[in-house]
Amino acid sequence: MPLAEQLRGLRSGDFSIGFAHTAEVGDDILTEPLWHDSLVVAVPARHPLLSHKAVPLHQLASYPLVLCDPQVYEGYYRELARLLRPLERQPDVAEHVSSLDMMLTLVGAGYGVGFIRASRIAATLRPDVVIRPLAMDSAVITTYLLRPVSEDLPVSAERFIARLREHSGD
């Protein structure tokens, strides 16, 4: 569900909690970081970037990117934009995609390089795509728990949040 829809639902009381990859959600929504995941790059097999064991960020400026759809994955896209901000020029975006499968298909076909959370590597095992880490420690995406500031949560939601907190370090 897009971030904007989640925020509308949280503000209207339709939702008690939500999840996002950005903490930029407004003052009326509380954010709590739950877990962190490294970002890695998906590179076509036989690509010049494969000469690096860890891909330097500035090297990505020379190649087209396959990025997530900014409306469907708004929070994730914001964090990717923040990560790419140090590049000296606007990245060349070959395509925006609405699924991991489509991104991997386009990367495997040589259309560009994509980004994946490290926890999703197992879902990306394909002969035409190679995964490489980024050569930077700050290439991390955080998943946040969202909840309205003024809302008393149902007991079931409180229990669910307690379980998330227990397992957030795993």
Short names for language-model regions:
Residues 39, 48, 55-75, 168:
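Short loop->beta-strand "edge-of-pocket" segments that line small-molecule binding or catalytic clefts
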Residues 1-2, 21-22, 89-99:
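Short beta-strand-to-loop elements that line the ligand-binding cleft
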Residues 40-42, 48, 66, 113, ...:
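Residues embedded in well-ordered beta-strands
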Residues 2-43, 56, 79, 103, ...:
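Short beta-strand-centered segments that line the small-molecule binding cleft or hinge
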Residues 93-125:
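C-terminal regulatory/effector modules of DNA-binding transcriptional regulators
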Residues 129-170:
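A late-sequence structural motif
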Residues 22-23, 45, 117-120, 143:
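Short secondary-structure boundary segments
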Residues 65-87, 153-157, 161-162:
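Secondary-structure junction motif
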